[in-house]
Amino acid sequence: HMKMILIGSGNVATQLGKNIVAQGNHQIIQVYSRNSANAQALANVVNSTATDDLTQINTEADLYIIAVSDSAIHSVIADLPKSLQGIVAHTSGATNLDVFADFINFGVIYPPQSINKSIETNLSVIPFGIEGNSTQTFEKLFSLIQAIAPKTFACTSQQRLALHLSAVIANNFSNALF
């Protein structure tokens, strides 16, 4: 049983949160968003509390899922207490694992596919890429995500970036052509 905090209230945070809660073994104890209305809206969906202040983040969680835009990851990480004992993980395809160098336990939970919070998404068909800074961290993240997405696999930062570029081309490139 893991206690988790969702950092972000957008597409990936919403679908991960809903699927983790529906799976039933884990609890989301807090949702952070810089927009308090968005934090509260997602907190209501996942039966949690909300905050719009990273200094008020619960420091007792087992996992902190950072599901924010690539442009916001660095500022969010800079504002998190570095003493967190729990795993800190982001969901970005393009952000290296070394952004967490100041933390103890860290990893990546990467869905290589566009996810929309307003469209119910069956995450079981998405092959999530998982990366961890240690075997123990990797195994915790892998077992958590594999329970909701059986096609989950291990990947390195290099593999994830290549996968991300492929996914961007497959999902978005044709839009750019027209």
Predicted stretch roles:
Residues 2-51:
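NAD(P)+-binding Rossmann beta1-loop-alpha1 motif at the extreme N-terminus of oxidoreductases
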